[in-house]
């Protein structure tokens, strides 16, 4: 086998439902059978219709895997699409039937489908101006949002001051940048944990809103010398949020009740995860992580639904690996090789525009994510980006510096930074596969690559992305 790029070694592969209750702010949804008519001729109908009543789409790398596209494709089969965590730091790029591009951050990707209700759960953090900006952008492009989005009354509010604090905190860390999006996500979750945050339901009590917001301002001013605060700023912000409160009111709902009633009524719910497991506050490469739980556990805590109701979970994984910002990346390709993947895959962040670091698919990290989440299947995305490479590598195991093989993905950052990756080398393929829609029509080398990933991860690949459009998807 050819020598591995970068560090490492290579070797060749050897309960009964109650009476119907209308969802708040939405016309009574058409039964699932009705929506099935539109996709009856779709060869993927059986694969999609077999998904559980409550299913989820979660990232299984460091984000940017292409979750939004799969959610967009699956959404017509579901009554509700729900976000359970994160905020505007999560970027989802989707395309409508005319090929128009939409870059969403907080609004769930199901918004392009008129029969789908979108829910932003209690585990998310809401920057109200940004939320309205997304809605205005959608509506200006002909996408109706009226009565189609519900925001949890328990979700926390993310203020501009959180974004200011985010930048000040990052500057304080000097050479130890976590690489945040500076969208205020971490400071907002910090306010939540220290119990001085404000929630969406506080917008219904403007008589006490100012006093609560004052505590946040004072706290930031006491903590950061660079944070300038005056009572005039507070007054302006309160007046601003009075206007926001009036506009947001039709969107506010007790989403815990809505979702659980919907489950009892046998409605289908698709959970759209933001970020990914390798950025999870508990399971990710801490401290280079996000501030919430983008893994399976975050579904329950971020929506208020029980673990027993969750069925199929689909892990989304790129055919290679990318990462934005700092943090360990064992299979990273530096220099020209990384540039080739970056340019071919147009690897620049949806939210930040930052160039993504690129490398080979890390099977050790993928298996770790599969263990944590219990994925029933995988969606392998951007397989087309690998076309034209003479050979493709899979990082199948890690060795420590002393040569001893690691038995699991290490939690210790120092250990992870020093691992030596063992690679399998597989043959590449020359042909452009972006127009292929049947698994059997893929080049033999591409099929072997997919099947080797299945073997190593122990989870079947049911969906294969071969381009950005919603139709550029192979069902296996």
Swiss-Prot record:
Ligand binding (GTP): 63-69, 91-93, 356, 382-384, 465-467
Any Pfam family the entry gives: Adenylsucc_synt
Class in the EC hierarchy, top level: ligase
Pathway(s) where this gene product acts: Purine metabolism; AMP biosynthesis via de novo pathway; AMP from IMP: step 1/2
Keyword Magnesium: yes
Residues reported in the UniProt entry to bind substrate: 350-356
Cofactor, free-text remark: Binds 1 Mg(2+) ion per subunit.
Region (Disordered): 1-34
InterPro entries: Adenylosuccin_syn_GTP-bd, Adenylosuccin_syn_Lys_AS, Adenylosuccinate_synth_dom1, Adenylosuccinate_synth_dom2, Adenylosuccinate_synth_dom3, Adenylosuccinate_synthetase, P-loop_NTPase
Residues reported to bind IMP: 64-67, 89-92, 181, 195, 275, 290, 354
GO molecular function: adenylosuccinate synthase activity; GTP binding; metal ion binding
Cofactor(s) recorded in Swiss-Prot or TrEMBL: Mg(2+)
Catalytic residues of the enzyme: 64 (proton acceptor), 92 (proton donor)
Note: This protein may be expected to contain an N-terminal transit peptide but none has been predicted.
Function summary: Plays an important role in the de novo pathway and in the salvage pathway of purine nucleotide biosynthesis. Catalyzes the first committed step in the biosynthesis of AMP from IMP.
UniProt xrefs under HAMAP family: Adenylosucc_synth (MF_00011)
PANTHER family: ADENYLOSUCCINATE SYNTHETASE (PTHR11846), ADENYLOSUCCINATE SYNTHETASE 1, CHLOROPLASTIC (PTHR11846:SF19)
Protein name in UniProt: Adenylosuccinate synthetase, chloroplastic
Record organism: Triticum aestivum
């Amino acid at each position: 086998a050819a020598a591995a790029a970068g560090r490492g070694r290579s070797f060749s592969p050897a309960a009964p439902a109650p009476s119907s209750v209308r969802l708040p702010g939405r016309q009574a949804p058409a039964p699932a059978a009705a929506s099935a008519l539109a996709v009856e001729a779709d060869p993927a109908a059986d694969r999609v219709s077999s998904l559980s009543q409550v299913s989820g789409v979660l990232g299984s790398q460091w984000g940017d895997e292409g979750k939004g596209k799969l959610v967009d494709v699956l959404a017509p089969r579901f009554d509700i699409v729900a976000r359970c965590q994160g905020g505007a730091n999560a970027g989802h790029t989707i395309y409508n039937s005319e090929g128009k591009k939409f870059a969403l951050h907080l609004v769930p990707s199901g918004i392009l489908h008129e029969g789908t209700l979108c829910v932003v759960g209690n585990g998310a953090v809401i920057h109200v101006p940004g939320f309205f900006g997304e809605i205005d952008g959608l509506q200006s492009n002909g996408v109706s949002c009226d009565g189609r989005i519900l925001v949890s009354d328990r979700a926390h509010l993310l203020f501009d001051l959180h974004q200011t604090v985010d930048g000040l905190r990052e500057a304080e860390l000097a050479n130890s940048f976590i690489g945040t999006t500076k969208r205020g996500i971490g400071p907002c979750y910090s306010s939540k944990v220290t119990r001085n945050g404000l929630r969406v339901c506080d917008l219904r009590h403007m008589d006490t809103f100012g006093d609560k917001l004052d505590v946040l301002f004072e706290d930031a001013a006491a903590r950061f010398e660079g944070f300038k605060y005056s009572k005039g700023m507070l007054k302006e912000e309160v007046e601003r949020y009075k206007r926001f409160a009036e506009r947001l009111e039709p969107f506010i709902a007790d989403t815990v009740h809505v979702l659980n009633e919907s489950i009892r009524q046998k409605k289908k719910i698709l959970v759209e995860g933001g970020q990914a497991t390798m950025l999870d506050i508990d399971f990710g490469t801490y401290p280079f992580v996000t501030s919430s739980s983008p893994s399976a556990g975050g579904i329950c805590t971020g929506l208020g639904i029980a673990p027993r109701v969750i069925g199929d979970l689909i892990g989304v994984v790129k055919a290679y690996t990318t990462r934005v910002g700092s943090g360990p990346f064992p299979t990273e390709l530096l220099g020209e090789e990384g540039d080739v993947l970056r340019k071919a895959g147009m690897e620049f962040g949806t939210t930040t525009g930052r160039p993504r670091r690129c490398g080979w698919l890390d099977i050790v990290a993928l298996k770790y994510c599969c263990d944590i989440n219990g994925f029933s299947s995988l969606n392998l995305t951007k397989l087309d980006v690998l076309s034209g490479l003479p050979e493709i590598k899979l990082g199948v195991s890690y060795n420590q510096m002393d040569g001893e093989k690691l038995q699991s993905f290490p939690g210790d950052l120092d250990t992870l930074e020093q691992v030596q990756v063992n690679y399998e080398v597989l043959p590449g393929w020359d042909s452009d596969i972006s127009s292929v829609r049947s698994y059997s029509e893929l080049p033999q080398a591409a099929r072997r690559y997919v099947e080797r990933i299945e073997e190593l991860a122990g989870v079947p690949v049911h969906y294969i992305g071969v381009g950005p459009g919603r139709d550029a998807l192979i069902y296996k």
